[in-house]
């Protein structure tokens, strides 16, 4: 009876508790919503202001290197949306964390699910619905993995093979707070490291006697197919990029690279090189880590996305949709001796026009926004554009019943195979040398459980190629002799330099230079040419250049990269602790001492620098750590790709046999006026030795595609 009497009171108490809990939850939700709404207004305004300022700056008579770099690194379309939402998430999280003790907003912890919902973290990349009968890749990379359709798609976070390491555990990079140490030692300034470790005189440059300039350029092509992390914007309308650029004020997403005492750039460029942090995305449920994760704006697959784009809107803009032949759009204003060039961008003015206002030639439009960054890259993009259209026309001749969409998709699929085959057959063996089989064994077929995403550390590992860039680029005539009045041009004059292609010889002289000239040798004592270390994006004497080495080091910290020894441990390599041990690993006591004097401990050496400092493996062009990191990544790219060219069902057996005949030399023969090419374009060749007529180079036979039904 007593229990029955107490029951109404118990129910009343439970009701009151439920009402109180409901009220608290409503208060928390309202507080989260109010906070997010305030942050959205602030961030959206900052993003709009930043874009408007960049347009204004680019219209000025004398834009700075920051403006040129900002144009190159700006996020667009869905990428910009994803980065903006990521910024709203992070700033809202920081505000709410400060409010917790005052308002008890989230009780035991922040309601991250509600926060994610209010921010709109799922909106930039909505849930994917896949057509399982579609025989072609999506432009975005979605639906490659049927169990996890988003795996490897564009505008997702780069994968972490080791947890991020930030100064505050969340987003601040090491080196942000003055006086704060890492592993007991202060971090050196990136520019100081660059000056002391990577500097050498251009005239002392050592060229690679066994690798052509194409070896360097192919690496950049592959990189631009796999990853791109655009810069984020300032998160506050009270703090602009101009303040970062002109006043070197660190704050928000500005992380300037300060010049050390005595640096010659102090006289010409003020106190610093402006540096803006990479764009990042929202964390995902179950929120095991809230550390900042940088975006990959591209698909992680080797799918020729630098030709076709990673967003549907861009992909459509790159096509000639009025043609029934599945063609890519070409430039309707200019051509290269009757051969097509890439279309111009519709942004006015573009950096390429700013560089040479007299010539007035805009930048080129391609699947990757960096296509006009340097002239050899623009040349490569031009070859790929021409090859797609050649393939589409030939496929149409063989299959007149195919419509434009099928012709486009089939040509696109063959282009993806071209990139894959040249990379794995011709490029990686001479990059990884004797370590190739250890890290990339023979293909055993598609594995659904393999994660193909590009890792955060790969974006630094693949920057080894910066050490292979020579100080000059050569243009050669039909006899592979110096072409024109300026046959050899310093690299810094070829940034954003499309006018040289349009008005000064076209791409053929540049392609010959790729085939016949040598890459720079990555050498411990002569690491990076001054054209990149002091004159990056410096097109003329009125614009002072960036330091690519210092940028790479600062970017390691921006991305929260673990140090050198953490990655050595990841790869099963020894972890040197003393000068003697580091000297043994590097086989170079002088270099080891420089690094120890700068960093105090090998644990702190930035991963990019530590990796490129190692001696090269036998018959390769990277050291043991890089062979591990690069080898693992490329194996994952291959084995985790359902559309890999060797995977049964992607191509027929006869088609695969035909595809193996593709080569860079054949690409040149079919798409330029060049008729003499080397048998092995990745090794330096001295004309006429090792050169043959194009008739001796095997052609891709497309007859296996005749009337093939997919």
UniProtKB/Swiss-Prot annotation:
<dbReference type="GO" id="GO:0046872">
    <property type="term" value="F:metal ion binding"/>
</dbReference>
<feature type="glycosylation site" description="N-linked (GlcNAc...) asparagine">
    <location>
        <position position="104"/>
    </location>
</feature>
<dbReference type="GO" id="GO:0140825">
    <property type="term" value="F:lactoperoxidase activity"/>
</dbReference>
<keyword id="KW-0479">Metal-binding</keyword>
<feature type="binding site" description="covalent">
    <location>
        <position position="373"/>
    </location>
    <ligand>
        <name>heme b</name>
    </ligand>
</feature>
<dbReference type="GO" id="GO:0001580">
    <property type="term" value="P:detection of chemical stimulus involved in sensory perception of bitter taste"/>
</dbReference>
<keyword id="KW-0597">Phosphoprotein</keyword>
<feature type="binding site">
    <location>
        <position position="299"/>
    </location>
    <ligand>
        <name>Ca(2+)</name>
    </ligand>
</feature>
<feature type="glycosylation site" description="N-linked (GlcNAc...) asparagine">
    <location>
        <position position="320"/>
    </location>
</feature>
<feature type="active site" description="Proton acceptor">
    <location>
        <position position="224"/>
    </location>
</feature>
<feature type="site" description="Transition state stabilizer">
    <location>
        <position position="370"/>
    </location>
</feature>
<dbReference type="GO" id="GO:0016323">
    <property type="term" value="C:basolateral plasma membrane"/>
</dbReference>
<keyword id="KW-0944">Nitration</keyword>
<feature type="binding site">
    <location>
        <position position="225"/>
    </location>
    <ligand>
        <name>Ca(2+)</name>
    </ligand>
</feature>
<feature type="propeptide">
    <location>
        <begin position="23"/>
        <end position="98"/>
    </location>
</feature>
<keyword id="KW-0349">Heme</keyword>
<dbReference type="GO" id="GO:0020037">
    <property type="term" value="F:heme binding"/>
</dbReference>
<feature type="glycosylation site" description="N-linked (GlcNAc...) asparagine">
    <location>
        <position position="131"/>
    </location>
</feature>
<feature type="disulfide bond">
    <location>
        <begin position="248"/>
        <end position="272"/>
    </location>
</feature>
<dbReference type="InterPro" id="IPR019791">
    <property type="entry name" value="Haem_peroxidase_animal"/>
</dbReference>
<feature type="disulfide bond">
    <location>
        <begin position="571"/>
        <end position="628"/>
    </location>
</feature>
<feature type="disulfide bond">
    <location>
        <begin position="130"/>
        <end position="143"/>
    </location>
</feature>
<dbReference type="GO" id="GO:0004601">
    <property type="term" value="F:peroxidase activity"/>
</dbReference>
<dbReference type="Pfam" id="PF03098">
    <property type="entry name" value="An_peroxidase"/>
</dbReference>
<dbReference type="GO" id="GO:0005737">
    <property type="term" value="C:cytoplasm"/>
</dbReference>
<keyword id="KW-0732">Signal</keyword>
<feature type="binding site">
    <location>
        <position position="305"/>
    </location>
    <ligand>
        <name>Ca(2+)</name>
    </ligand>
</feature>
<feature type="disulfide bond">
    <location>
        <begin position="352"/>
        <end position="363"/>
    </location>
</feature>
<keyword id="KW-0963">Cytoplasm</keyword>
<keyword id="KW-0106">Calcium</keyword>
<feature type="binding site" description="covalent">
    <location>
        <position position="223"/>
    </location>
    <ligand>
        <name>heme b</name>
    </ligand>
</feature>
<feature type="disulfide bond">
    <location>
        <begin position="669"/>
        <end position="694"/>
    </location>
</feature>
<comment type="function">
    <text>Heme-containing oxidoreductase which catalyzes the conversion of thiocyanate (SCN(-)) into antimicrobial agent hypothiocyanous acid (OSCN(-)) in the presence of hydrogen peroxide (H2O2). Also involved in the conversion of iodide (I(-)) into hypoiodite (IO(-)) in the presence of H2O2. Responsible for the inactivation of a wide range of micro-organisms and hence, important component of defense mechanism. May be implicated in airway host defense against infection.</text>
</comment>
<feature type="modified residue" description="3'-nitrotyrosine">
    <location>
        <position position="480"/>
    </location>
</feature>
<feature type="binding site">
    <location>
        <position position="301"/>
    </location>
    <ligand>
        <name>Ca(2+)</name>
    </ligand>
</feature>
<keyword id="KW-0575">Peroxidase</keyword>
<keyword id="KW-0560">Oxidoreductase</keyword>
<dbReference type="GO" id="GO:0042742">
    <property type="term" value="P:defense response to bacterium"/>
</dbReference>
<dbReference type="GO" id="GO:0005615">
    <property type="term" value="C:extracellular space"/>
</dbReference>
<feature type="disulfide bond">
    <location>
        <begin position="244"/>
        <end position="254"/>
    </location>
</feature>
<feature type="binding site" description="axial binding residue">
    <location>
        <position position="466"/>
    </location>
    <ligand>
        <name>heme b</name>
    </ligand>
</feature>
<comment type="similarity">
    <text>Belongs to the peroxidase family. XPO subfamily.</text>
</comment>
């Amino acid at each position: 009876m007593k229990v029955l009497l107490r029951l109404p009171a118990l129910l009343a108490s439970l009701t009151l508790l439920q009402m109180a809990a409901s009220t608290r939850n409503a208060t928390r939700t309202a507080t989260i919503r109010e906070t997010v709404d305030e942050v959205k207004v602030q961030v959206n305004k900052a993003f709009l202001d930043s874009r408007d300022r960049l347009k204004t700056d680019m219209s000025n008579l004398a834009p700075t290197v920051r403006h040129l770099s900002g144009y190159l690194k700006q996020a667009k379309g869905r990428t910009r949306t994803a980065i903006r939402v990521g910024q709203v998430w992070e700033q809202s999280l920081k505000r709410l964390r400060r409010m917790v003790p005052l308002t008890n907003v989230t009780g035991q912890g922040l309601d991250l699910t509600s926060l994610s919902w209010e921010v709109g973290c799922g909106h930039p990349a909505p849930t994917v619905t896949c057509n399982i009968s579609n025989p072609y890749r999506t432009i975005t990379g979605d639906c490659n993995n049927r169990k996890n359709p988003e795996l490897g798609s564009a505008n997702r976070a780069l994968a972490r093979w080791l947890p991020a390491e930030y100064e505050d555990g969340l987003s601040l990079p090491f080196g942000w707070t003055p006086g704060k140490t890492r592993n007991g030692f202060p971090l050196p300034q990136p520019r100081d490291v660059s000056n002391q470790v990577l500097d050498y005189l251009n005239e002392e440059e050592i060229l690679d006697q066994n690798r052509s300039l194409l070896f360097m350029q192919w690496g950049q092509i592959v990189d631009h197919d796999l990853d791109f992390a655009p810069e984020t914007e300032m998160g506050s309308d009270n703090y602009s990029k101009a303040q970062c650029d002109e006043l070197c004020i660190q704050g928000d997403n500005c992380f300037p690279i300060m010049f050390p005492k005595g640096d010659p750039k102090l006289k010409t460029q003020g106190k610093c090189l402006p540096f803006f942090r990479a764009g990042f995305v929202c964390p995902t449920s179950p929120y095991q880590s809230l550390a900042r994760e940088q975006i990959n704006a591209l698909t992680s697959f080797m799918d020729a996305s630098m030709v076709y784009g990673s967003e549907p809107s861009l992909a459509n803009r790159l096509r000639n949709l009025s043609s029934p032949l599945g063609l890519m759009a070409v430039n309707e204003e200019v051509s290269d001796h009757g051969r097509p060039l890439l279309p111009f961008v519709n942004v006015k003015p573009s950096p390429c026009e700013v560089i040479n206002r007299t010539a007035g030639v805009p930048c080129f439009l391609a699947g990757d926004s960096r296509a006009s960054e340097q002239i050899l890259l623009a040349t490569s993009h031009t070859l790929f554009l021409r090859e797609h259209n050649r393939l589409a026309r030939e496929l149409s001749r063989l299959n007149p019943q195919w419509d434009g969409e099928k012709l486009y998709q089939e040509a696109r699929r063959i282009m993806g195979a071209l990139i894959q085959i040249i990379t794995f057959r011709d490029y990686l063996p001479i990059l990884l040398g004797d370590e190739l089989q250890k890290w990339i064994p023979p293909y055993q077929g598609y594995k659904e459980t393999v994660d193909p995403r590009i890792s955060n550390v790969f974006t630094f590992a693949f920057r080894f190629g910066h050490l292979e860039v020579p100080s000059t680029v050569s243009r050669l005539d039909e006899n592979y002799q110096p072409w024109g009045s300026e046959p050899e041009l310093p690299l810094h004059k070829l940034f954003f330099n499309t006018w040289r292609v349009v008005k000064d010889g076209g791409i053929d002289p540049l392609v010959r230079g790729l085939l016949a000239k040598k890459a720079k040798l990555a050498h411990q004592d002569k690491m990076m040419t001054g054209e990149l270390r002091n004159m990056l994006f410096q097109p003329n004497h009125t614009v002072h250049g960036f330091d690519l080495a210092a940028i790479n080091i600062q970017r390691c910290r921006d991305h929260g990269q673990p140090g050198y020894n953490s990655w050595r441990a990841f790869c099963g390599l020894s972890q040197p602790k003393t000068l003697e041990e580091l000297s043994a690993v590097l086989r170079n006591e002088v270099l080891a001492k420089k690094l120890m004097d700068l960093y105090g401990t090998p644990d702190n050496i930035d991963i990019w620098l530590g990796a490129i400092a190692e001696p090269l493996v036998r018959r390769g062009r990277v050291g043991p750590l890089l062979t591990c990191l690069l080898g693992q990544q490329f194996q994952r790219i291959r084995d985790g790709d359902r559309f890999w060219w060797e995977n049964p069902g992607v191509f027929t057996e006869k088609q695969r046999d035909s595809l193996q005949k593709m080569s860079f030399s054949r690409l040149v023969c079919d798409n330029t006026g060049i008729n003499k090419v080397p048998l092995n374009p990745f090794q330096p060749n001295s004309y006429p030795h090792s050169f043959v007529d194009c008739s001796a180079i095997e052609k891709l036979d497309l007859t296996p595609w005749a009337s093939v039904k997919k």
